[in-house]
């Protein structure tokens, strides 16, 4: 059974332009679902939409939206109002490196909107639809920083922790329904952003050896959908979390994560 047959005609990817979001779009289209692609780079999304339409004979919509704005969801919800919605993935994120007091409040507010407020509005909106029709699926994307916290990148980790715990709770609430909900927690992933900032030498080589591709992440997410509520992506990441929780204190884990960003 394809995703379209199981969940409905349309899926929405929030943060669809590249990386994991793009891989979600490709997976939906491959399984016959029409795709609503939401992001800031409208032309790039249209190019992706045409590529998917020509390859998989699906339909698409592009919604240009800035997730950091308080009214970001207005045009998103309007664009999907009359569609047979069956899937949602929230991939969008925003972070800023530095100590809390050294980051301008405007940046903090933007991160709260992207990582918490807009996420929650979208999750609430589409869950109401899926629950009412007793059909649909949600996969939200968290990060290892949401498990450990992320010193010098604190708001990002806190936002990902909110996505992680909120989605886990809703996933449990929907277990005995026909709505499948899952959160997938990512480690290092080979997105265009990572590749453009990859350090040279042994450090960069080490990252390349452990990182997953967006396609690997999305494949695992769908493999576990309807079977597990909360997934840590990749065997290395699963083993790492297990080791730290079994053999180290929470303080050790926090300081370890902080060592990656400490100024």
UniProtKB/Swiss-Prot annotation:
<dbReference type="InterPro" id="IPR051019">
    <property type="entry name" value="VLCFA-Steroid_DH"/>
</dbReference>
<dbReference type="GO" id="GO:0030573">
    <property type="term" value="P:bile acid catabolic process"/>
</dbReference>
<feature type="site" description="Transition state stabilizer">
    <location>
        <position position="143"/>
    </location>
</feature>
<keyword id="KW-0753">Steroid metabolism</keyword>
<keyword id="KW-0521">NADP</keyword>
<dbReference type="GO" id="GO:0000166">
    <property type="term" value="F:nucleotide binding"/>
</dbReference>
<keyword id="KW-0443">Lipid metabolism</keyword>
<comment type="similarity">
    <text>Belongs to the short-chain dehydrogenases/reductases (SDR) family.</text>
</comment>
<keyword id="KW-0442">Lipid degradation</keyword>
<keyword id="KW-0547">Nucleotide-binding</keyword>
<feature type="binding site">
    <location>
        <begin position="40"/>
        <end position="41"/>
    </location>
    <ligand>
        <name>NADP(+)</name>
    </ligand>
</feature>
<dbReference type="InterPro" id="IPR036291">
    <property type="entry name" value="NAD(P)-bd_dom_sf"/>
</dbReference>
<dbReference type="InterPro" id="IPR002347">
    <property type="entry name" value="SDR_fam"/>
</dbReference>
<dbReference type="Pfam" id="PF00106">
    <property type="entry name" value="adh_short"/>
</dbReference>
<keyword id="KW-0560">Oxidoreductase</keyword>
<feature type="binding site">
    <location>
        <begin position="66"/>
        <end position="67"/>
    </location>
    <ligand>
        <name>NADP(+)</name>
    </ligand>
</feature>
<keyword id="KW-0088">Bile acid catabolism</keyword>
<feature type="binding site">
    <location>
        <position position="240"/>
    </location>
    <ligand>
        <name>NADP(+)</name>
    </ligand>
</feature>
<feature type="binding site">
    <location>
        <begin position="17"/>
        <end position="21"/>
    </location>
    <ligand>
        <name>NADP(+)</name>
    </ligand>
</feature>
<feature type="active site" description="Proton acceptor">
    <location>
        <position position="156"/>
    </location>
</feature>
<dbReference type="GO" id="GO:0047022">
    <property type="term" value="F:7-beta-hydroxysteroid dehydrogenase (NADP+) activity"/>
</dbReference>
<comment type="function">
    <text>7beta-hydroxysteroid dehydrogenase that catalyzes the reduction of the 7-oxo group of 7-oxo-lithocholate (7-oxo-LCA), to yield ursodeoxycholate (UDCA). As R.gnavus is a common core bacterium of the human gut microbiota, this enzyme contributes to the formation of UDCA in the human colon. UDCA is regarded as a chemopreventive beneficial secondary bile acid due to its low hydrophobicity; it protects hepatocytes and bile duct epithelial cells against necrosis and apoptosis induced by more hydrophobic secondary bile acids like deoxycholate (DCA).</text>
</comment>
<feature type="site" description="Lowers pKa of active site Tyr">
    <location>
        <position position="160"/>
    </location>
</feature>
<protein>
    <recommendedName>
        <fullName>7beta-hydroxysteroid dehydrogenase</fullName>
        <ecNumber>1.1.1.201</ecNumber>
    </recommendedName>
</protein>
<dbReference type="GO" id="GO:0016042">
    <property type="term" value="P:lipid catabolic process"/>
</dbReference>
């Amino acid at each position: 059974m394809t995703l379209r047959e199981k969940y409905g005609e349309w899926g929405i990817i929030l943060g669809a332009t590249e990386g994991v979001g793009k891989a979600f779009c490709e997976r939906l289209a491959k399984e016959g679902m029409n795709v609503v692609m939401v992001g800031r780079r409208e032309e790039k999304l249209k190019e992706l939409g045409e590529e998917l339409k020509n390859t998989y004979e699906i339909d698409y919509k592009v919604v240009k939206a800035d997730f950091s704005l308080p009214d970001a969801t207005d045009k998103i919800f309007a664009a999907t109002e009359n569609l047979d919605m069956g899937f949602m993935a929230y991939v969008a994120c925003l972070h800023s490196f530095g100590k809390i007091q050294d980051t301008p409040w405007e940046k903090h507010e933007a991160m709260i909107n992207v990582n918490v407020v807009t996420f929650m509005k979208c999750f609430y909106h589409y869950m109401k639809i899926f629950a009412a029709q007793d059909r649909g699926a949600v996969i939200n994307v968290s990060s290892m920083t949401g498990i450990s916290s992320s010193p010098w990148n604190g708001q990002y980790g806190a936002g990902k922790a909110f996505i992680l715990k909120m989605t886990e709770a809703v996933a449990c609430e929907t277990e005995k329904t026909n709505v499948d909900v899952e959160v997938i927690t990512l480690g290092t992933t080979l997105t265009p952003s990572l590749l453009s900032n990859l350090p040279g030498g042994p450090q960069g080589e080490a990252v390349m050896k452990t990182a997953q591709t967006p396609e690997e992440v999305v494949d695992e997410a769908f493999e576990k959908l309807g079977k597990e509520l909360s997934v840590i992506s990749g065997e290395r990441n699963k083993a790492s979390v297990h080791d730290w929780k079994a053999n180290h204190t929470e303080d050790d884990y926090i300081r370890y994560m902080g060592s990656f960003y400490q100024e």
